[in-house]
Amino acid sequence: MTNTLNTAENRRTMYLLEGNIGAGKTSLGNVLKASSQFEFLEEPVDTWREGFAGNLFEMFYTDMPRWSFTFQIMAFTTRAKTWSEILEKVSGDQVVLERSIYTDRNVFAKNLYAVGAMNDSEWQVYQQLWEFLAQNYCDKPDKILYLRTPAELCLERIKMRGRNEEQQMQLDYLKRLE
């Protein structure tokens, strides 16, 4: 794959903004964007709510064992699409992406597999698709910014931001993601 970020005529620095759900990634990303020194690409939550045959964001949080595989495939592919399409269009020389394909696999999907919400076959399919898309469609980041926020504070923030889909989230789930 041609690296869309780092060709000789188009050198950009790509930062991944990582952290638990409710850690403050969007808030920090918006502060960086307001500085006019960074482009900020938010996690595509609206796509997960409206871009498919149902609100997969809500379906996932309502019935994780049923929707884990579907949601993780969708979340990963929307991020890969973001990297391959949107990054070509941004004009800034410093780009911050909220969350990444690496967290999709190494935190979320891996955790769901470990607790039995994805079976062996689903996990193997997920990993093979992840490897293919990561190698062929996703540029490697230059830096990773990780917000370490206690799970208890993350849960408070999740409740305050008021996304209906997340209101039943449990503290133990956030602790497993740390």
Please provide the spans of the model-predicted regions:
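P-loop (Walker A) phosphate-binding loop of NTP-binding proteins
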Residues: N20
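A basic- and aromatic-enriched beta-loop-alpha substructure that forms the phosphate/nucleotide-
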Residues: F71, F76-N119
